[in-house]
Amino acid sequence: MAVTECEWASLGSRIGLRAALVLLSGSLLVVLFPLSGLEHQYRTALNILLQCNLWGGDDRHTFTGQTRGLAVASTAIELLVLKQKPTSDVKFEAKAALNQALEMKRQGKKEKAHKLLHHALKMDPDHVDALNELGILLEEEKDIIQADYLYSKALTISPHNEKALINRDRTLPLVEEIDQRYFSLIDSKVKKLMSIPKGNPALRRVMEESYYHHIYHTVAIEGNTLSLSEIRHIIETRYAVPGKSLEEQNEVIGMHAAMKYVNATLVSRIGSVTIDNILEIHRRILGYVDPVEAGRFRRNQVFVGHHIPPHPRDVEKLMQEFVQWLNSEEAMSLHPVEFAALAHYKLVYIHPFVDGNGRTSRLLMNLILMQAGYPPITVRKEQRSEYYHVLEIANEGDVRPFIRFIAKCTESTLDLLLIATAEHPVGLPEPNHGFSECKQTITIKT
């Protein structure tokens, strides 16, 4: 599928960083915090510094990222989460709620049992028995994917738990089959889209519109206040919008430059993806906002919510391993959506840059999709919470929900393109706060 500059979809997220000064052990340290983080994340990172020797020692895990297939949880995750462990009284309450839930289930009152199990896990999120019992209840309700997720979480907490192992062995093949069927559905929609002539006027219009929507949602997720029409004005005229932040407008110009580079230079190129390619993408993304840091690896430790990315001295080695994986037969053998999602996650996990990691990861993801004949995908700003939630789940050890999220976004993008090129086409939905996600799907006749 030939790709023009306009064949971009909307997606966006960035994890930016701001300097904050922290007094620790009589020394003044500079610590970088996420721009998009909430106030409690600042406090969390500060507490981590006060409670552990973050800078000392070599006893650290580094991400080797050997994930194989959608149904396999990611391993070797370097995650430092400051969780308040439940007190003995809270654990007792969770146990009591679990016992009461089992009694309600025995009496056939499944709705009450469901609520009690949720209450038990709210009290004690790592209660393995409650995770197992809620999973069994969800299995009975035919929610196999969520049940399998709960069993996987139980095994993350207690790897040798016999009940969780038995439950997971039962759901795993079913989940694999569900995932593969969904990939097949996406493939059928890609095939239908590719059957539309390249010169189709409706397709050209919607691709052009999706280009601007991509930039709009990418920067809006980060708090950028520019409207879709203002972004179009900046890109088309290169003139500033009066009364708007120049930094916000430079973010738009940087995204435009990076997308043009990927589309014109990398999509149709034959050969391996290199570290230099990734650095060039980042140099354009950040070049108009922070030219000093643009296109080079970070030299400071950073915090991303509860996640502590690898130490800066490990970044270059991890990036070499990442690029080696990108070009490996193992990665190439994956379904394109799974490959693209894993590439996104692995890069954003390493977090090699001071800023712009999310945007770089998403552009790399779309590069992989386009090279496989898929359209670049749309993730709207209204999906921001879900997007970060599944990334957090991946950091906890299960990358499958993130892959499914990317698959859902891929299908939504395909649906929009197919709807727009139907007999009675409609345009892309206008940005608004009430739009959550595109839930409509198109039945493919075989």
From Swiss-Prot:
Q: Keywords in UniProt for this one?
A: ATP-binding, Endoplasmic reticulum, Glycoprotein, Hydrolase, Magnesium, Manganese, Membrane, Nucleotide-binding, Nucleotidyltransferase, Repeat, Signal-anchor, TPR repeat, Transferase, Transmembrane, Transmembrane helix, Unfolded protein response
List the catalytic residues.
Answer: H351
Q: What is its EC number?
A: 2.7.7.108, 3.1.4.-
| Residue numbers on the Lumenal membrane side | 40-446
SUPFAM superfamilies attached here? Answer: Fic-like, TPR-like
Where does motif Inhibitory (S/T)XXXE(G/N) motif map?
218-223
**Tell me, which GO biological process terms does this entry list?**
protein adenylylation; protein deadenylylation; regulation of IRE1-mediated unfolded protein response; response to endoplasmic reticulum stress; response to unfolded protein
Cytoplasmic compartment: which residues?
Answer: 1-18
Cell compartments where the protein resides: Endoplasmic reticulum membrane
Its placement in the membrane is given as: Single-pass type II membrane protein
The positions annotated as site (Important for autoinhibition of adenylyltransferase activity) read E222
Question: What does the record say about activity regulation?
Answer: The side chain of Glu-222 determines which of the two opposing activities (AMPylase or de-AMPylase) will take place. In response to endoplasmic reticulum stress, mediates de-AMPylase activity. Adenylyltransferase activity is inhibited by the inhibitory helix present at the N-terminus: Glu-222 binds ATP and competes with ATP-binding at Arg-362, thereby preventing adenylyltransferase activity. In unstressed cells, disengagement of Glu-222 promotes adenylyltransferase activity.
What InterPro entries does this protein's entry cite?
Fido, Fido-like_dom_sf, Fido_containing, TPR-like_helical_dom_sf, TPR_rpt
Start and end residues of the TPR repeats are: 94-127, 128-161
Q: Where is the Fido domain?
A: 273-408
User: Subunit details for this protein?
Assistant: Homodimer.
- Annotated family: Belongs to the fic family.
Protein role: Protein that can both mediate the addition of adenosine 5'-monophosphate (AMP) to specific residues of target proteins (AMPylation), and the removal of the same modification from target proteins (de-AMPylation), depending on the context. The side chain of Glu-222 determines which of the two opposing activities (AMPylase or de-AMPylase) will take place. Acts as a key regulator of the ERN1/IRE1-mediated unfolded protein response (UPR) by mediating AMPylation or de-AMPylation of HSPA5/BiP.
Tell me the protein's name.
Protein adenylyltransferase FICD
Native species of this protein?
Xenopus tropicalis
Name the gene for this chain: ficd
